[in-house]
Amino acid sequence: SAAGISLAHIEAGLSSFTPVQGRSRAIGAVWQGRPITLVDDSYNANPDSVRAAIDLLRELPAPHVLVLGDMGEVGEQGASFHEEVGQYAASQGIEHLLTLGALARYSAARHSAAQHAGDRAQDWPQAWDMLQGLLPHAGSVLVKGSRFMGMERIVQAMLHAADGTQERMAPCC
């Protein structure tokens, strides 16, 4: 027991835990008969949380696709912060970066400059169309962006179009 609570009770509580939507929620999806891990981290983004998300994505099955919307509240350093996370994604072996937003284009440019695939969508329907072209080859997809970008629309479109889904307790599983 721990703190007077039985381990069985703790295990039961942890096994019923469901992460909050948009906060590193891992979902096992089937796309055209292939398993894909989708991580919905669409609720918010800043340079530190994007780097942490990239670290998480790197641990999941490859090939990796990072769908990144603009990070908000970055002030005058917005372009450089976005370049930095694009470079970090490339340095961590993220094979494909798909961006959405005026500032996220700097992430795609830096990722592409490091000899990795980086694409920039003009709007979320175009981002979804581009992502559909990547999904047949993806092992894991992580969606991240600041709240105002509405990146959850990409997650919802993917879940709606998937052959099937299953919530996972943690992204590591």
Question: Where in the sequence are the language-model features?
Answer:
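ATP-dependent carboxylate-amine ligase
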Residues: 1-173
